[in-house]
Amino acid sequence: MSIYTDHTWEGVTYAWQNVTMLDSIVTYRGTRVEMIHRPKWGIACYMDNAIQSCEIDEALYHESLVHPVMSSVSCPKRVMIIGGGEGATAREVLKYPTVECVDMYEWDKDVVKLFQSKYPQWAKGAWDDPRLHLYHDDIFKTIEEYPVDQYDIVIIDLFDPSNATYDSWKHLLKHINKWVRSEGSVVMYAGIRERTSSEQSYEMLANMMMTMSGVMDDNILYKNRITPYRVFVPSFSGESTFLLLSSNTDFKIDHTIGSHVTDLVWKSYQTFNW
């Protein structure tokens, strides 16, 4: 009997029985990527032994990440995605007919190649959409530059915020404002809500942005309202949290594109003790 041990949470180990290892690679960026089939749960992606996505419930995460921010801007045309190597974030963005250009910055091209060649069920055709443009640059260097054209929406789909990644997040958030037009919006994955932790990752990011709003006079982005929300994703064994920055505070989710996210998502933050 084959067993895969999952060490996503510190001090906790999950043992998945009767698994099938479909792929195990080390990317040129040094990340170990494992694609595993788990009975009843389907195929899951692990990076450095931490769960990243599972085909049975990835839509819960990706729809929650994308549809609120897409609904916050009237007729969004230009969208920037930071991360999102499975292609599912792009899949949800490209459902909007007003979108003309999606620039996706995923620095690990080996992850993209793996999902393009073997696991198309995540992207569901997004890779072939001519509106999607892929870049494998280091976003933390690219972000220091000034863009040729600003975006209506920026979606940050990166690693969990933590003390170890604090400086990287601070650097990214310091420079991202010049990539977004003044009426645009930004959303970011803000980590898993940990009931056993006294310091939540979404609080760290929110505090970082609120500090920036007070010291960066030219940073219009962080003058906007920060709206937190969350969704429970079974594969993550916890609640994924998100932060939305938008000057538009009066909008509803666009249901014409088949989103399963309801407007009740905004009430989810009320249990945060924000």
Predicted regions and their residues:
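SAM/dcSAM-binding transferase cores
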Residues: 2-37, 210-213, 227, 233-274
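The AdoMet/dcAdoMet-binding core of the Class I SAM-like
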Residues: 2-8, 28, 54-216, 237-238
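Short, isolated positions in well-ordered beta-strands
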Residues: 33, 52-53
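Short strand-connecting beta-turns/loops that link adjacent beta-strands
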Residues: 40-41
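A general beta-strand register signal
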Residues: 46-47
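Structured N-terminal alpha/beta-domain signature
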Residues: 154-157, 169, 183, 231, ...
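Conserved short secondary-structure elements within globular domains
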Residues: 216-230
